[in-house]
Design a protein with these regions (language model features):
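RecB-family 4Fe-4S metal-dependent nuclease core
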Residues: 1-153
């Protein structure tokens, strides 16, 4: 669990601080020296446009590891006193492996993204955004008011 401060993102202030439970599955965690390197295995083809989203995903995993209890870490075979120093991802179809040091900007970005999601939740602001690859397969499509607009069809 982490605390998202009401002022995490000044552009999207929250009404109060929130305790957020993080949950996810990390594909692999490697130990290198005195630190850990989580690795994500991905399907699909690598493209450079995926760099920023991958960094955010890995920053989420770093938050998850570093805010887990000692018992949870030990159960997963991890030493509680070691930090995540790097992160990595692997796209087998493209034979692409990337490893880099943790980026502070990515850590800040993922916290702000969580704050923005809470901000939207508090205000019930979830505007529909059409994307042809996903909207057509959404189970909500048939009753989505925005999906029925003439400009989408």
């Amino acid at each position: 669990e982490i605390i998202i401060d009401a002022n995490t993102d000044p552009k999207y202030p929250l009404r109060r601080d929130y305790k957020v439970h993080l949950q996810g599955i990390i594909d692999r965690v490697f130990r290198e020296g005195d630190g850990y390197i989580p690795m994500e295995f991905k399907t699909g083809k690598w493209s450079d446009s995926k760099m920023s989203p991958m960094r955010k995903e890995m920053a989420f995993y770093k938050l998850m590891i570093e805010n887990s209890s000692e018992a949870v870490l030990r159960q997963a075979g991890l030493e509680p006193n070691l930090d995540v120093t790097h992160w990595s991802w692997y796209y087998p179809i493209s034979n692409f492996i990337h490893v880099e040091k943790v980026k502070k900007t990515s850590m800040t970005s993922v916290l702000k993204s969580i704050a923005r999601l809470i901000h939207a939740y508090e205000r019930k602001l979830f505007p529909a955004k059409f994307f042809y690859k996903t909207c057509a397969h959404c189970s909500y499509f048939g009753i989505c008011e925005a999906a029925q607009e003439d400009t989408w069809l």
